[in-house]
Amino acid sequence: MKDELALTIANTIINGFERHFAIFTEITQSARNRFQQCQWNEIHRSARARTNFYDERVKETFNDIKEDFNISSLDDALWQRVKAVYSDLLINHKQPELAETFYNSVFCHLFERKYYHNDYIYVESTAHRLDDKTQPEIYTSYQPKELGLKQTICDIMNSHRTVIPFEDLDRDVDALINTFRRKAHKTRVKLEDLKFDILNFTFYRNKGAYLIGRVLSPAGETPFIIAVLNNEKGGLYIDALLTSSESMAVVFGFARAYFFVDCEHPYALVNFLQGLMPHKTKADLYSAIGFHKQGKTQFYRDFLNHLDSSDDQFELAAGIKGMVMSVFTLPSYPYVFKIIKDKFSPSKNITKKDVKGKYRLVKLHDRVGRMADTMEYSEVAFPKSRFNDELLAELQKVAPSIIRYEGEGEEALIIIEHLYIERRMVPLNLYLMDALKNKAQQKIDDALFGYGQAIKQLISADIFPGDMLLKNFGVTRHGRVIFYDYDEIAYMNEINFRVKPKAVTEEQLYAAEPWYSVMPGDMFPEELATFALANPSYLKAFKIHHEDLLTAAYWQQCQQDVANGIYKDVFPYPDKYRFCNLSFGSIKR
């Protein structure tokens, strides 16, 4: 009887997953038509909807099980059997790792944290069984010796193009070949020694389409991305070629929106991509291709493995303490853990619910490469012995309502009810202080250029950052400036950008408080110079490229552009890589 019940429950869960994956695939496939028809707003709407689908299907499946099987408590033997049966259902499945994560999500909705171990859920994945099977064909190989280099590349591009033709494929392929020769030294071999491996599907995101592959030669492997854009006049053109793991990693960065990529075998795809970008984790790559829940699962497995192989202690993160969040980190692991405080500083007129809403907004919005993606977790257990006394005291002081303890001695755990995890960066204020101390003017100039660019790209994507103090931005290992303090973000239409009234009397000039009326939502751009850029050397470097950010007129124009549906192009690669900016025969449009 229990075997039959276990099979029925397992089938209910797998059917829920299949519903989810079918809907996910349908909306992913729509990106191709959206790209062809230049429906950029629809692409953003689809991205937001797709992110929500997973939780909706989990809740549906959870409700089905609760109602159909009257589940109120865990039957140990039954649920071990359910997991065993479910594992059998995944033996020949195309997405076993995703289906395991879906199972975990449903189970965790049904039962308490004390049951979250490998007897009942997939703490350890069984998807590694795929490594022993014949790998699915997710890429096509091309050998230029047969048709010549130019014709081979033309064939590659045409095999991926949509119903829209290239505006001048001959010109673009010449630019590709020139760029390969200049930048990819390992491709400078005889044609008979070259081979291209090209993934069989196009990666879509925002206004771009990306072809991804590698060139193999006796000199080694060269990964690459070809960026294709729509000229919005009925033609496609190649905009850039990236030929290094580092530049590709930025395209797949944690501050970018998720790709739309129609692939039935994500396990094989992630393995291929990791071969091209070894510094990217599987968690990074699953998230980048749209499976953010799988990214969370993979991250947590990696984190548990790291805890087992390390012995350093968690500690408070470097930088100025936040008024809303408390942040801690593990020095040997490149992430930070953020919890919402029970009480905020008086100047913060928001609630916990508001803060969670802001983080959700960022998850659903186009992050334009300037807002860090976060992973949200509930009921997370840490070994208490790994927390230093200062951190334990701080957590107990600022967030006692979400902290509890289980077990004793070496087995003691600290359970955090709710937290966010994101990539660790160097706070911009500390980065600049270090550069100033070491008289590294170029680093100061680059960082403040990036700071201004981050603000401009955020507001052009309809995100007002709110608190723009330097401490709320971080610098990545690639040198990019990223915003990561979300509790005051707003849409542009919610803000009133004003010119600060000029003081006309001595009393007004030296007033401790504003002598003019200030309403909620008012923002005075010129105050950036006073509050965020008080150091004269910072302000000087900032003004070289971004003096316009100190004027209300600039912000008002951006606000009007957003209201009119005008969004500036933000490319996930430097302008210097764009073919229109390269020295060889400048491509004009």
UniProtKB/Swiss-Prot annotation:
It comes from the Bacteria. The active site is at D373. It catalyses: L-seryl-[isocitrate dehydrogenase] + ATP = O-phospho-L-seryl-[isocitrate dehydrogenase] + ADP + H(+). Coiled coil: none annotated. ATP binds at A317, A318, G319, I320, K321, G322, M323, K338. Bifunctional enzyme which can phosphorylate or dephosphorylate isocitrate dehydrogenase (IDH) on a specific serine residue. This is a regulatory mechanism which enables bacteria to bypass the Krebs cycle via the glyoxylate shunt in response to the source of carbon. When bacteria are grown on glucose, IDH is fully active and unphosphorylated, but when grown on acetate or ethanol, the activity of IDH declines drastically concomitant with its phosphorylation. This is Isocitrate dehydrogenase kinase/phosphatase. It comes from Colwellia psychrerythraea (strain 34H / ATCC BAA-681). The lineage of its organism: Bacteria, Pseudomonadati, Pseudomonadota, Gammaproteobacteria, Alteromonadales.
